Curated annotation (Swiss-Prot):
Cell wall-binding repeats lie at residues 175-194, 196-215, 217-237, 238-257, 258-277, 280-301. The gene is lytA. GO terms for molecular function: N-acetylmuramoyl-L-alanine amidase activity. This is Autolysin. The C-terminal domain could be responsible for the substrate recognition. Its EC number is 3.5.1.28. GO terms for cellular component: extracellular region. PROSITE patterns: CW (PS51170). It is found in: Secreted.
Length: 318
Protein backbone atom coordinates (compact mmCIF):
# COMPACT_ATOMS: atom_id res chain seq x y z
CA UNK A 1 0.00 0.00 0.00
CA UNK A 2 1.58 3.25 -1.16
CA UNK A 3 1.38 6.19 1.25
CA UNK A 4 2.44 9.74 0.35
CA UNK A 5 4.38 11.35 3.23
CA UNK A 6 5.20 14.68 1.56
CA UNK A 7 2.98 16.54 4.08
CA UNK A 8 3.86 14.53 7.20
CA UNK A 9 4.17 16.87 10.17
CA UNK A 10 6.76 16.02 12.80
CA UNK A 11 5.94 18.90 15.16
CA UNK A 12 2.63 17.59 16.50
CA UNK A 13 2.33 17.05 20.27
CA UNK A 14 1.96 13.66 21.86
CA UNK A 15 -1.48 13.15 23.37
CA UNK A 16 -1.75 10.58 26.15
CA UNK A 17 0.70 7.74 26.55
CA UNK A 18 1.27 4.37 24.94
CA UNK A 19 -0.25 1.91 24.41
CA UNK A 20 -2.83 3.52 22.15
CA UNK A 21 -5.80 1.22 21.75
CA UNK A 22 -7.93 2.68 18.97
CA UNK A 23 -7.88 3.53 15.26
CA UNK A 24 -10.43 6.23 14.46
CA UNK A 25 -12.50 6.39 11.26
CA UNK A 26 -13.54 9.88 10.11
CA UNK A 27 -14.79 11.72 7.04
CA UNK A 28 -13.99 15.37 6.40
CA UNK A 29 -17.48 16.89 6.39
CA UNK A 30 -16.32 19.15 3.55
CA UNK A 31 -18.04 18.62 0.17
CA UNK A 32 -15.17 20.46 -1.54
CA UNK A 33 -12.35 18.55 0.11
CA UNK A 34 -9.55 16.94 -1.87
CA UNK A 35 -6.73 14.90 -0.45
CA UNK A 36 -4.28 17.66 -1.35
CA UNK A 37 -6.16 20.66 0.03
CA UNK A 38 -6.90 18.78 3.26
CA UNK A 39 -3.21 17.90 3.58
CA UNK A 40 -2.17 21.48 2.83
CA UNK A 41 -4.56 22.85 5.45
CA UNK A 42 -3.46 20.30 8.04
CA UNK A 43 0.17 21.24 7.33
CA UNK A 44 -0.30 24.88 8.28
CA UNK A 45 -3.09 24.90 10.87
CA UNK A 46 -2.72 25.21 14.62
CA UNK A 47 -2.65 21.68 16.11
CA UNK A 48 -4.91 22.85 18.94
CA UNK A 49 -7.68 23.07 16.34
CA UNK A 50 -7.33 19.33 15.85
CA UNK A 51 -5.07 16.97 13.97
CA UNK A 52 -5.10 13.44 12.57
CA UNK A 53 -2.74 11.01 10.89
CA UNK A 54 -4.05 10.12 7.40
CA UNK A 55 -6.28 11.35 4.59
CA UNK A 56 -7.77 9.12 1.88
CA UNK A 57 -9.00 10.62 -1.37
CA UNK A 58 -8.54 11.03 -5.10
CA UNK A 59 -7.17 7.51 -5.38
CA UNK A 60 -4.35 7.95 -2.89
CA UNK A 61 -3.41 8.06 0.79
CA UNK A 62 -1.47 10.88 2.44
CA UNK A 63 0.00 10.60 5.90
CA UNK A 64 -0.04 14.00 7.58
CA UNK A 65 0.69 13.13 11.19
CA UNK A 66 2.45 10.45 13.24
CA UNK A 67 0.91 7.20 14.41
CA UNK A 68 1.18 5.75 17.93
CA UNK A 69 1.14 9.29 19.26
CA UNK A 70 -2.45 10.12 20.22
CA UNK A 71 -4.29 12.94 18.43
CA UNK A 72 -6.81 15.72 18.94
CA UNK A 73 -9.34 14.17 16.61
CA UNK A 74 -12.47 13.06 18.50
CA UNK A 75 -13.00 15.88 20.98
CA UNK A 76 -12.93 13.92 24.19
CA UNK A 77 -11.21 11.39 26.40
CA UNK A 78 -10.39 9.02 23.56
CA UNK A 79 -8.01 11.50 21.97
CA UNK A 80 -5.56 9.80 24.30
CA UNK A 81 -6.37 6.40 22.76
CA UNK A 82 -5.69 7.36 19.12
CA UNK A 83 -3.11 5.13 17.48
CA UNK A 84 -4.18 6.59 14.11
CA UNK A 85 -6.99 8.81 12.81
CA UNK A 86 -8.06 8.46 9.18
CA UNK A 87 -10.11 11.04 7.24
CA UNK A 88 -12.04 10.21 4.04
CA UNK A 89 -12.74 13.11 1.66
CA UNK A 90 -16.38 13.92 0.87
CA UNK A 91 -16.16 15.32 -2.67
CA UNK A 92 -16.65 12.25 -4.85
CA UNK A 93 -18.73 12.85 -7.97
CA UNK A 94 -19.26 9.24 -9.09
CA UNK A 95 -19.76 5.88 -7.39
CA UNK A 96 -16.62 4.63 -9.09
CA UNK A 97 -14.55 7.47 -7.61
CA UNK A 98 -16.04 6.80 -4.20
CA UNK A 99 -15.44 3.05 -4.35
CA UNK A 100 -11.81 3.56 -5.33
CA UNK A 101 -11.24 5.57 -2.16
CA UNK A 102 -13.52 3.40 -0.03
CA UNK A 103 -11.35 0.38 -0.82
CA UNK A 104 -8.26 2.32 0.25
CA UNK A 105 -10.04 3.55 3.38
CA UNK A 106 -11.02 0.03 4.47
CA UNK A 107 -7.60 -1.40 3.68
CA UNK A 108 -5.78 1.37 5.54
CA UNK A 109 -7.97 1.13 8.66
CA UNK A 110 -7.46 -2.64 8.78
CA UNK A 111 -3.72 -2.33 8.17
CA UNK A 112 -3.33 0.25 10.93
CA UNK A 113 -5.21 -1.99 13.37
CA UNK A 114 -2.86 -4.85 12.49
CA UNK A 115 0.14 -2.56 12.86
CA UNK A 116 -1.02 -1.53 16.32
CA UNK A 117 -1.87 -5.08 17.36
CA UNK A 118 -5.54 -4.16 17.74
CA UNK A 119 -8.60 -6.24 16.88
CA UNK A 120 -10.21 -5.44 13.53
CA UNK A 121 -13.59 -4.77 15.09
CA UNK A 122 -15.84 -1.76 14.59
CA UNK A 123 -17.68 0.15 17.31
CA UNK A 124 -17.82 -2.66 19.84
CA UNK A 125 -18.07 -2.35 23.62
CA UNK A 126 -14.40 -3.21 24.00
CA UNK A 127 -12.08 -0.22 24.41
CA UNK A 128 -9.67 -1.57 21.80
CA UNK A 129 -10.43 -1.63 18.09
CA UNK A 130 -11.54 0.59 15.23
CA UNK A 131 -14.02 3.30 16.25
CA UNK A 132 -16.00 5.77 14.17
CA UNK A 133 -16.16 9.38 15.28
CA UNK A 134 -19.87 8.87 15.92
CA UNK A 135 -19.15 6.02 18.31
CA UNK A 136 -16.55 8.13 20.12
CA UNK A 137 -19.03 11.02 20.41
CA UNK A 138 -21.60 8.74 22.02
CA UNK A 139 -19.33 6.67 24.26
CA UNK A 140 -16.06 8.39 25.20
CA UNK A 141 -15.51 10.05 28.58
CA UNK A 142 -15.40 13.85 28.70
CA UNK A 143 -17.01 14.16 25.30
CA UNK A 144 -17.16 17.62 23.71
CA UNK A 145 -17.97 16.49 20.17
CA UNK A 146 -21.21 16.32 18.20
CA UNK A 147 -19.69 14.65 15.12
CA UNK A 148 -21.35 11.57 13.64
CA UNK A 149 -18.99 10.86 10.74
CA UNK A 150 -18.35 8.89 8.65
CA UNK A 151 -21.79 7.23 8.57
CA UNK A 152 -23.85 9.93 6.79
CA UNK A 153 -21.34 10.21 3.97
CA UNK A 154 -20.99 6.45 3.57
CA UNK A 155 -24.79 6.17 3.42
CA UNK A 156 -24.86 8.72 0.59
CA UNK A 157 -22.98 6.19 -1.54
CA UNK A 158 -24.98 3.17 -0.44
CA UNK A 159 -22.73 1.87 2.34
CA UNK A 160 -24.89 0.97 5.34
CA UNK A 161 -23.64 0.69 8.90
CA UNK A 162 -23.87 -3.08 8.60
CA UNK A 163 -21.88 -3.08 5.36
CA UNK A 164 -19.17 -0.85 6.82
CA UNK A 165 -18.85 -3.09 9.87
CA UNK A 166 -18.67 -6.18 7.66
CA UNK A 167 -16.00 -4.63 5.46
CA UNK A 168 -13.90 -3.49 8.43
CA UNK A 169 -14.10 -6.83 10.20
CA UNK A 170 -13.85 -9.15 7.19
CA UNK A 171 -12.16 -7.12 4.48
CA UNK A 172 -13.82 -5.71 1.42
CA UNK A 173 -15.29 -8.19 -1.01
CA UNK A 174 -14.27 -6.94 -4.43
CA UNK A 175 -16.44 -7.60 -7.45
CA UNK A 176 -13.82 -8.21 -10.10
CA UNK A 177 -14.06 -8.35 -13.88
CA UNK A 178 -16.46 -6.38 -16.03
CA UNK A 179 -18.84 -4.00 -14.24
CA UNK A 180 -21.66 -1.90 -15.70
CA UNK A 181 -23.78 1.08 -14.74
CA UNK A 182 -25.88 3.63 -16.62
CA UNK A 183 -22.74 5.33 -17.93
CA UNK A 184 -20.97 2.27 -19.31
CA UNK A 185 -18.56 -0.58 -18.63
CA UNK A 186 -15.35 -0.69 -16.64
CA UNK A 187 -13.02 -3.49 -15.58
CA UNK A 188 -11.99 -4.23 -11.98
CA UNK A 189 -8.75 -6.03 -11.11
CA UNK A 190 -8.37 -8.38 -8.17
CA UNK A 191 -6.87 -5.58 -6.06
CA UNK A 192 -9.88 -3.34 -6.71
CA UNK A 193 -8.06 -1.05 -9.13
CA UNK A 194 -9.28 -0.40 -12.65
CA UNK A 195 -7.59 0.87 -15.82
CA UNK A 196 -7.99 4.56 -16.68
CA UNK A 197 -6.81 6.57 -19.69
CA UNK A 198 -4.99 3.59 -21.19
CA UNK A 199 -5.10 0.55 -23.43
CA UNK A 200 -5.49 -2.78 -21.65
CA UNK A 201 -5.47 -6.33 -22.97
CA UNK A 202 -8.16 -8.46 -21.32
CA UNK A 203 -8.57 -12.14 -22.20
CA UNK A 204 -6.62 -11.63 -25.42
CA UNK A 205 -8.57 -8.56 -26.58
CA UNK A 206 -7.42 -4.94 -26.52
CA UNK A 207 -9.69 -2.23 -25.06
CA UNK A 208 -9.27 1.42 -24.22
CA UNK A 209 -10.51 3.02 -21.00
CA UNK A 210 -11.09 6.77 -20.65
CA UNK A 211 -9.92 9.06 -17.86
CA UNK A 212 -12.86 7.98 -15.68
CA UNK A 213 -12.20 4.29 -16.32
CA UNK A 214 -15.05 3.65 -18.76
CA UNK A 215 -14.51 1.43 -21.80
CA UNK A 216 -14.69 3.16 -25.18
CA UNK A 217 -17.24 1.62 -27.54
CA UNK A 218 -18.46 2.42 -31.05
CA UNK A 219 -16.11 5.36 -31.39
CA UNK A 220 -12.79 6.65 -32.67
CA UNK A 221 -9.85 7.70 -30.56
CA UNK A 222 -6.74 9.60 -31.59
CA UNK A 223 -4.04 8.39 -29.23
CA UNK A 224 -0.94 10.22 -28.02
CA UNK A 225 1.09 8.32 -30.63
CA UNK A 226 -0.75 10.31 -33.31
CA UNK A 227 -2.63 7.30 -34.66
CA UNK A 228 -6.37 6.77 -34.89
CA UNK A 229 -8.00 3.68 -33.38
CA UNK A 230 -11.53 2.30 -33.66
CA UNK A 231 -13.40 0.44 -30.93
CA UNK A 232 -16.53 -1.46 -31.93
CA UNK A 233 -19.77 -1.63 -29.96
CA UNK A 234 -18.31 -4.38 -27.76
CA UNK A 235 -15.26 -2.22 -27.01
CA UNK A 236 -12.88 -4.44 -28.97
CA UNK A 237 -10.08 -2.58 -30.73
CA UNK A 238 -10.28 -2.98 -34.50
CA UNK A 239 -7.58 -4.75 -36.52
CA UNK A 240 -7.64 -5.63 -40.21
CA UNK A 241 -10.51 -4.45 -42.39
CA UNK A 242 -13.52 -2.82 -40.71
CA UNK A 243 -16.62 -1.23 -42.24
CA UNK A 244 -17.56 1.89 -40.29
CA UNK A 245 -20.45 4.14 -41.34
CA UNK A 246 -20.51 2.48 -44.80
CA UNK A 247 -16.80 3.08 -45.39
CA UNK A 248 -13.97 0.57 -45.27
CA UNK A 249 -10.85 1.16 -43.17
CA UNK A 250 -7.75 -0.90 -42.54
CA UNK A 251 -6.05 -1.20 -39.14
CA UNK A 252 -2.66 -2.83 -38.56
CA UNK A 253 -1.96 -5.52 -35.95
CA UNK A 254 -1.42 -2.81 -33.30
CA UNK A 255 -4.82 -1.30 -34.13
CA UNK A 256 -3.55 1.87 -35.81
CA UNK A 257 -5.57 3.09 -38.81
CA UNK A 258 -3.51 3.06 -42.01
CA UNK A 259 -3.48 5.62 -44.80
CA UNK A 260 -2.01 5.58 -48.30
CA UNK A 261 -1.11 2.39 -50.11
CA UNK A 262 -1.65 -0.92 -48.32
CA UNK A 263 -0.86 -4.37 -49.69
CA UNK A 264 -3.27 -7.01 -48.41
CA UNK A 265 -3.09 -10.64 -49.57
CA UNK A 266 -0.95 -9.69 -52.59
CA UNK A 267 -3.42 -6.99 -53.65
CA UNK A 268 -2.92 -3.24 -53.41
CA UNK A 269 -5.49 -0.84 -51.95
CA UNK A 270 -5.40 2.90 -51.42
CA UNK A 271 -6.67 4.50 -48.21
CA UNK A 272 -7.46 8.20 -48.18
CA UNK A 273 -4.43 10.12 -46.93
CA UNK A 274 -6.46 12.23 -44.48
CA UNK A 275 -9.55 10.24 -43.53
CA UNK A 276 -8.24 6.69 -43.97
CA UNK A 277 -11.31 5.43 -45.86
CA UNK A 278 -10.66 2.99 -48.71
CA UNK A 279 -10.80 4.65 -52.15
CA UNK A 280 -12.78 2.82 -54.84
CA UNK A 281 -13.89 3.43 -58.42
CA UNK A 282 -11.44 6.31 -58.66
CA UNK A 283 -8.07 7.38 -60.07
CA UNK A 284 -5.12 8.12 -57.78
CA UNK A 285 -2.16 10.05 -59.14
CA UNK A 286 1.27 8.48 -58.71
CA UNK A 287 3.63 10.04 -56.17
CA UNK A 288 5.90 11.37 -58.91
CA UNK A 289 2.97 12.85 -60.80
CA UNK A 290 3.72 11.00 -64.03
CA UNK A 291 0.66 8.78 -64.11
CA UNK A 292 -2.51 7.52 -62.54
CA UNK A 293 -3.67 4.36 -60.82
CA UNK A 294 -7.20 3.09 -61.02
CA UNK A 295 -8.98 1.55 -58.02
CA UNK A 296 -11.82 -0.76 -58.97
CA UNK A 297 -15.27 -0.64 -57.31
CA UNK A 298 -14.10 -3.19 -54.71
CA UNK A 299 -11.06 -1.03 -53.91
CA UNK A 300 -8.48 -3.31 -55.49
CA UNK A 301 -5.83 -1.84 -57.78
CA UNK A 302 -6.47 -2.50 -61.47
CA UNK A 303 -3.49 -4.30 -62.98
CA UNK A 304 -4.74 -4.09 -66.56
CA UNK A 305 -6.80 -1.58 -68.57
CA UNK A 306 -10.33 -1.39 -67.24
CA UNK A 307 -11.34 1.91 -68.81
CA UNK A 308 -11.76 3.41 -72.25
CA UNK A 309 -11.00 6.87 -73.58
CA UNK A 310 -13.91 7.87 -75.83
CA UNK A 311 -13.37 10.00 -78.96
CA UNK A 312 -14.56 13.10 -77.12
CA UNK A 313 -12.05 12.47 -74.33
CA UNK A 314 -14.55 11.01 -71.88
CA UNK A 315 -13.04 8.21 -69.77
CA UNK A 316 -15.39 5.35 -69.04
CA UNK A 317 -14.77 2.33 -66.83
CA UNK A 318 -16.03 -1.20 -67.23
Amino acid sequence: MEINVSKLRTDLPQVGVQPYRQVHAHSTGNPHSTVQNEADYHWRKDPELGFFSHIVGNGCIMQVGPVDNGAWDVGGGWNAETYAAVELIESHSTKEEFMTDYRLYIELLRNLADEAGLPKTLDTGSLAGIKTHEYCTNNQPNNHSDHVDPYPYLAKWGISREQFKHDIENGLTIETGWQKNDTGYWYVHSDGSYPKDKFEKINGTWYYFDSSGYMLADRWRKHTDGNWYWFDNSGEMATGWKKIADKWYYFNEEGAMKTGWVKYKDTWYYLDAKEGAMVSNAFIQSADGTGWYYLKPDGTLADKPEFTVEPDGLITVK
